[in-house]
C-alpha cells in the first residue's frame, strides 16, 4: 500500500463545535497511531477531501508527522471549488493552513457546488485513487463516513482494498490512557 484515504465524521456529527474540544485530542492520537503504523507498512500518500472535522484533524496529524517522516505526503482533493465559502472564519483559516502545508491540492469537479452528485463522485474518486481507507466510524451511528465505506466495500469485493476503522472503543481507550497518565503525573508532583 502506498496511498490511503483518511476520513471520518464531520465535526458537528460528533457534537464538536469548538476547535479546542478535548475529543479532538483523542481523535488525533488515534489517527497518529494508525498513520504511524501505515508509514511503517510503506504508505507514502495520505488523501483527504478537506471536509471539516476528522479529515482536517487527520491532515494536521500528517503535517506534524512530516517533521519526522519527510517522505510522506498529503493531498487535499476537494469535491468542488470553494467548499469552505460558507464556513466560519476560524475553520476557513485552519483549512487554508492545511492547504498551504499540503503537497498536492486540487478540486475533483473543478466547479463550485452544484449538488450531492459531487459528493458521491468525491467518495468514489478518493477510494479509486487509494489502496485503502482509514476511517473513524461507529457502526451504531452511520453518518457521513458510511458513504465512503459503501464505496470502499464495493471495491473490496472486486479487488484487495484495505479498510481500517478507528472506533469509539479505540477513542475511549485513548481517553482512559490519557486520564491515567494525567493522574500519574499529579501523583508524582
Curated annotation (Swiss-Prot):
List the InterPro entries. Answer: YspA
SUPFAM superfamilies in the record: MCP/YpsA-like
Write down the Pfam families for this protein, in alphabetical order.
YpsA (PF06908)
The UniProt family comment states: Belongs to the UPF0398 family.
User: In its UniProt entry, what is this protein called?
Assistant: UPF0398 protein BH1768
Query: Which species?
Result: Halalkalibacterium halodurans (strain ATCC BAA-125 / DSM 18197 / FERM 7344 / JCM 9153 / C-125) (Bacillus halodurans)
What is this organism's lineage?
Bacteria, Bacillati, Bacillota, Bacilli, Bacillales
Amino acid at each position: 500500500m502506498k496511498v490511503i484515504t483518511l476520513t471520518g465524521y464531520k465535526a458537528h456529527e460528533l457534537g464538536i463545535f469548538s476547535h479546542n474540544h478535548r475529543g479532538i485530542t483523542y481523535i488525533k492520537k488515534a489517527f497518529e497511531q494508525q498513520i504511524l503504523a501505515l508509514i511503517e507498512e510503506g504508505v507514502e500518500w495520505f488523501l483527504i477531501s478537506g471536509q471539516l472535522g476528522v479529515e482536517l484533524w487527520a491532515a494536521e496529524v500528517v503535517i506534524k508527522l512530516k517533521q519526522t517522516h519527510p517522505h510522506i505526503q498529503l493531498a487535499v482533493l476537494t469535491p468542488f471549488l470553494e467548499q469552505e465559502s460558507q464556513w466560519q472564519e476560524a475553520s476557513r483559516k485552519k483549512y487554508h493552513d492545511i492547504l498551504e502545508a499540503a503537497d498536492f491540492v486540487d478540486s475533483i469537479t473543478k466547479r463550485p457546488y452544484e449538488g450531492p452528485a459531487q459528493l458521491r463522485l468525491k467518495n468514489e474518486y478518493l477510494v479509486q485513487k487509494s489502496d485503502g481507507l482509514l476511517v473513524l466510524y461507529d457502526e451504531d451511528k452511520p453518518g457521513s463516513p458510511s458513504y465512503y465505506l459503501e464505496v470502499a466495500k464495493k471495491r473490496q469485493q472486486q479487488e484487495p482494498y484495505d479498510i481500517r476503522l478507528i472506533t469509539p472503543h479505540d477513542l475511549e481507550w485513548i481517553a482512559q490512557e490519557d486520564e491515567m497518565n494525567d493522574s500519574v503525573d499529579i501523583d508524582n508532583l
